[in-house]
Amino acid sequence: MELEKRIYVGGLSSSIESSDLESRFSRFGSVSNLEIINKSTPVGTIQRFAYLNFRTDEDKWQKCKSYLSNATFKGSKLRIEEARPYYLVKLQQEKKIADLQSTNNDEKNEDHSSKVDLEDPVFHGEIIVPGKHSKNMQVVTDSDVRKDPPRKGWKKGPYGRAIVVLRMYNKNTKKTRFFYPLGKNCLQKLWGRVETNMDNTTAFYDSDHDEYVSYGGKRASRDKIRMQAKLGIKASTQKDDNDFELLNNTTGEIEVTKELNEEQLDALRKKDKDTAASVLAELFGSENTEEIDTVSKTSGVLELDNDSTNNFQKEGLDEQDNLQKEESVHIDVPAEFEAFDERTAVVNVDNLKEMFSSNAQDTSKFSLFGNENGVGEESEMESEIDDRNYETMEEEADGETPLAIVKASSGTKGWPKMFTLPNPSSLFQPGNEDYTSREALESWWSENRLFLTRDYKRKRKDAVKRQRRAHEKRIRLV
């Protein structure tokens, strides 16, 4: 069987010519397209090699390699190898193969189109829909999916509508994923819908001022709402008590709440006070309220001032007579609270004395502000105990060893250790010495190695994968 090969001949000297190579290779077959190439190297020398087309059979080719390979010819050692085909010849061959494949594909497409035209009634024009066509090509209605079993490839939606199942194929994983929407917003309900009534809204838009006005009179500009949306600030969820005021308004006019002046506020406070007094009169009777008023008239006054210290002031009676005769003290509200409400509070002084004194005999010495020096009296026993403790602390401080700074030697590096020696000593150890044993370190590492080398990122990825698979499985079951 004849073979046609392209042969590479290397190691040629300057004295070898093309006629010499042709005479040598013609003994084993026919030679054609012999070409000798001179290639200059970076060193400055010239490298010579040759390419030739050689036609022969298998036996002669083996003999040619055994005789001429590594043979010495005119002072040069020949090197014979099978070379790659010439690049122009290779391009021609590839073009021929591509032309043959294109002609074969055209013939197949013509055959396929003729079959589709004859067999597939859904085919229109030159469009070929990939995939399989259903055997039942009738129109699918909502009643078809309500049957048992429903039409193949269709599912029942949330409102009883027919929804097609989408099959998505992943080329990488080579798996098919089924997806069909079952959410409440996937389809719009055609009947039985409840539209929101604009009369039940809690605010309206004022086009003159470009702002929203609630039924309570609160205003919010559109620019402020846009800025909050850009910055990601959530709108306040504070409830307006007058949002539903329009429901009780028969005239249909919107009432806007305004700020009240001081006279109107005083009138409202007086009205609230009268209602509270009437409620107390119904609960406890009118006699109790009169007694409270009489007590407040003849009682002492305790003023609470922020600028100076709190002091008792006598009003009509001395302090000693007032504590013995009167059972209560009248406390006026500070001036900063007078604008809100004028109220009085009744305080029983006897109860205060019982709270802040241990015995009834010490009531005469009782004072909210301490003794004359401004500090409460201290017992003799407590002072003696404090003196003893102070003396013992001084003795311990005298007997304590001084603070010692231990520095590392010149040959070692380490931070100085500062500590108090239990006994005076002249032997100091270097600051960088490790007092932990090797066995203790190895035992600690064996116990905590699993926790310290745990890969949290990998575990999180695995958890996300498991969660996604469970979600896909849940969708298939539905």
UniProtKB/Swiss-Prot annotation:
The keyword Nucleotide-binding does not apply. Residues 5-85 form the RRM domain. It is found in: Nucleus, Nucleolus. InterPro entries: NOP8_RRM, Nucleotide-bd_a/b_plait_sf, RBD_domain_sf, RRM_dom. The keyword Nucleus applies. The modification Phosphoserine is found at residues 207, 308. Gene3D superfamilies: 3.30.70.330. GO terms for biological process: ribosome biogenesis. This is Uncharacterized RNA-binding protein P16F5.06.
